[in-house]
Amino acid sequence: MWAKTWACGQKRGQNVPMSYVVIFRSTRKLDDGQLYSEWSEKMEALVKTIDGYEHHFGFRDAISRDGVTVSYFTSLEAISQWKNLNEHKMAQQLGRDSFYEEYSVQVCEVLRDYGFEA
């Protein structure tokens, strides 16, 4: 399932401010998911407190357990603030220890934003 999102609530093609995107790709370990769900909810609430956070969306394939989360921020400073929050650092360590078989992170600058809407 793909989610459709627009930066800052604006439609594509309008004067959208500079954005940066963090792409988090991961493969979940096999587990009951309870602790993961708890931490996922905590992190979802926490990221929304970052000045410069815009929005995010994600999806995960139930069979392969591969997932992608795409998060939008207005600045590299906001991304750094998010990365270095103590509670987020605890979640990162839990991810390495308990939640993920592997993951990768890419930080990208949005150069163009356009699309089609019927």
Q: Where does each model-flagged region fall?
A:
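Short arginine-rich
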Residues: 92-95, 99-101
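Short S/T/G/P-rich N-terminal loop/turn motif that feeds into the first structured element of a domain
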Residues: 2-67, 76-84, 100-118
